[in-house]
A protein has these predicted regions:
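C-terminal helical subdomain
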Residues: 163-228
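Rossmann-fold scaffold of SDR-type NAD(P)-dependent oxidoreductases
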Residues: 8, 80-89, 134, 184
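Conserved glycine-rich Rossmann-like NAD(P)H-binding loop of the short-chain dehydrogenase/reductase
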Residues: 26-41
Length: 228
């Protein structure tokens, strides 16, 4: 049976490296983000490598759109074996002034969108004993220095979303274990080269993170690991 990975929040860094890593292992790849043009170019680049890849533009902060997305991917590429969640939303940088809409936007993508995708893909994941793989970040950790960094970087909203997402990985993993569905997270401790967070001093190669995701997928343990 053909295996398909749903790559949510595709961009030039980790998610593209994950698409290449899994595609090289025979997976069909569904690329998801909001920019149709960028997605089409990325899918074309993967196809040039001999990987079956298609672009699926969607708003991952809209639950109805996420549910419809999963159905489109299933109809086009077959049952979903892996959900890779790399999507995030900025905004709500200063929680003393952020609007409720800004706070919701971050959580809608980072938490609610992920839960919705898992719910929609659940029959496929159960049938194939699949996996949910989440890109985490160091801002999720409870630490005075990290909290101070989140404030100074204007990333308070992202920090609380990543913290909620980190807990989500744990509880989803506990809930889905009886269905033999693996849930894992790679927490990235630093900036990844070639991404929006690269200010010229990034030290982490996206391919290294992708390789760790592949290791998690094959070993199905541990629940959380770190790169950086």
């Amino acid at each position: 049976m053909t295996k398909t990975i749903l790559v949510c929040g595709h961009g030039p860094g980790i998610s593209d490296a994950v698409a290449r890593q899994f595609g090289a292992q025979g997976f069909s790849v569904a690329l998801v983000a909001r920019s149709a043009d960028k997605l089409a170019a990325a899918a074309e680049a993967l196809c040039a490598l001999g990987i079956t890849a298609k672009a699926f533009p969607a708003d991952l902060g809209d639950p109805a759109a996420v549910t419809e997305l999963v159905a489109r991917v299933r109809d086009s590429l077959g049952p979903i074996t892996v959900v890779h969640w790399n999507a995030y939303a900025g905004g709500a940088g200063d929680l003393t002034t952020a609007s409720p809409a800004e706070l919701r936007a971050s959580l809608d993508v980072g938490v609610i969108g992920l839960v919705t995708a898992v719910q929609a893909a659940l029959p496929d994941l159960q049938a194939q004993q699949g996996a949910v793989l989440v890109t985490g970040g160091g801002l999720s950790f409870y630490d005075d220095k990290i909290d101070a960094l989140a404030v100074s970087w204007g990333a308070m909203g992202l920090a609380i979303t990543k913290a909620a997402q980190h807990k989500l990985v744990g509880v989803l993993g506990a809930r889905l274990a009886k269905d033999n569905i693996y849930v894992g997270e790679v927490v990235v401790l630093g900036s990844v080269k070639g991404t929006a967070f690269d200010a010229g001093n990034a030290t982490i190669e996206a391919s290294r993170v992708a390789a760790r995701f592949w290791e998690l997928y094959e070993a199905r343990t541990p629940r959380v690991t770190q790169v950086g």
